[in-house]
């Protein structure tokens, strides 16, 4: 698999950051004092290799997530920058942690001593960028209608990105060239739900029929279906998400370095999910979670 080098990762951040984001980074870190913000933003956009280091700066975290006047800059920050800062903050916090709480119910937490594995996951700049992009993509989760041919006649069907069964149903009707993208997004949804809304994933566990349909969509051999449909909800979502990412990678017509990160996360899906649990608990929900509406029951 190809790997993303520092320049490619930096460019990935630059693709998402607004000029206001870049001005915020320059202002808070004082990396670029002169000339004024527009020129500072242009300089950073032309030197994106500096962006990950600036996003990880503790002063930027305080400017975005700090209390009161410290967070005055937060109104300038895009959702992508906010999530990127949260991901880098998690990497910093995990450096001094030996255990990370795992949710055992709406209010319950049990300590799991897997912090070294989570540190290793966030040790990759490409995986940090992946998580920031994933979170930002769900601030505008898609929904609407798509066209399907039913009994030889075109029909309009409604869909929501968070409805895994309906999204998987599109695999039967879309052109073959579109299927890798749907598999990728199915994996994204499984990771997002178990990472940010694990209580919802447990409370709305898949029934045997839906689980079997999704296992079939994930190209899981039928002999494994019975065992997997009775697995705990989070375990099943983890299995499906990793499987969908692998199928997306295997079907991709061009295997780029950016897509290779998807295959990499497939092998570390549980660590990715646990990192998102930590980010949600420490950064997103304590601030009131203005970014994500809870999934509909």
Where in the sequence are the language-model features?
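Long, non-catalytic protein-protein interaction scaffolds
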Residues: 1-266
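Helix-rich, well-folded core regions that mediate interactions or catalysis
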Residues: 287, 293-297
């Amino acid at each position: 698999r190809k790997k993303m080098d520092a320049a490619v990762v930096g460019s990935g951040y630059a693709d998402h950051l607004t000029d206001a984001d870049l001005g915020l980074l320059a202002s808070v870190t004082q990396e670029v004092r002169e000339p004024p913000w527009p020129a500072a933003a242009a300089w950073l956009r032309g030197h994106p290799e500096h962006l990950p280091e600036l996003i990880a700066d503790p002063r930027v975290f305080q400017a975005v997530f700090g209390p009161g006047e410290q967070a005055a800059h937060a109104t300038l920050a895009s959702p992508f920058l906010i999530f990127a800062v949260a991901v880098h903050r998690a990497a910093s916090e995990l450096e001094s942690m030996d255990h990370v709480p795992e949710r055992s119910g709406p209010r319950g937490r049990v300590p799991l001593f897997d912090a070294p594995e989570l540190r290793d996951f966030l040790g990759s700049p490409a995986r940090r960028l992946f998580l920031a992009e994933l979170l930002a993509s769900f601030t505008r989760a898609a929904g609407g209608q798509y066209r399907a041919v039913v009994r030889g006649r075109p029909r309009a069907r409604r869909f929501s990105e968070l409805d895994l069964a309906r999204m998987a149903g599109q695999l039967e009707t879309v052109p073959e060239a579109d299927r890798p993208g749907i598999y990728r997004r199915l994996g994204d949804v499984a990771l997002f739900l178990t990472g940010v809304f694990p209580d919802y994933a447990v409370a709305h566990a898949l029934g045997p029929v839906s689980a079997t349909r999704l296992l079939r969509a994930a190209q899981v051999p039928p002999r494994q279906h019975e065992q997997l449909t009775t697995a705990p909800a989070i375990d099943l979502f983890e299995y499906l998400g990793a499987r969908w990412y692998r199928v997306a990678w295997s079907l991709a017509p061009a295997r780029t370095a950016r897509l290779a990160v998807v295959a990499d996360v497939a092998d570390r899906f549980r660590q990715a999910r646990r990192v998102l649990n930590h980010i949600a608990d420490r950064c997103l929900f304590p601030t009131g979670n203005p970014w994500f509406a809870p999934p509909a029951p």
